[in-house]
Amino acid sequence: MLGVLSVFGAPSALSAEDDERIALRAFLESHIEASDSFEDRYAAEVWLVDMSARLEPFVADADDRLELLRQIHAAASRSELTPELVLAVIEVESAFDRFAVSRAGAQGLMQVMPFWREEIGRPGDNLTVNTTNLEYGCRILQYYLAREDGALHRALAGYNGSSGSRIYSDKVKRAWTRRWKGAPLDWTR
């Protein structure tokens, strides 16, 4: 608690932005863990073969593609997200470049801001490691989807830090529609 107070000041001085940051930090701390993601081997093979062909323009090596797809599927599944939505977010955020760094300093596939490592007490995490970046990014997106009651446009705007604008979410929707479309998603909100 003292760490929170030293970063944000006295509890009465917390702004709505600080409250949200604290809530997201608690959510991340409680949800970063590992589990298996495919129902069975057949489902895994069908999905991996299909998505591997779609990912080939971004990742040339077949083994690298399959490993990345397994990692994406696992992180998305743990976060109760469709892997195809995560693929669309990654295409827009980094074009699948795990070493991508934004002008604001966001890093990796899902362009996670480095301050989250300190916020959740994991300062040694490397955001250019795919599994780490995917876990952070998927959990952050999961948080915003829950906060926005499943409204994709608003959740994606929150993820991107562009609340109130549909520019980013429309880019993700275009990527999803053009390349990653899988299970139906409600893009009406």
Predicted regions and their residues:
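Bacterial N-terminal signal peptides
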Residues: 1-9
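Boundary at the C-terminal end of the N-terminal hydrophobic targeting segment
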Residues: 9, 13-16
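Catalytic glycan-binding domains that act on GlcNAc-containing polysaccharides
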Residues: 22-23, 31-189
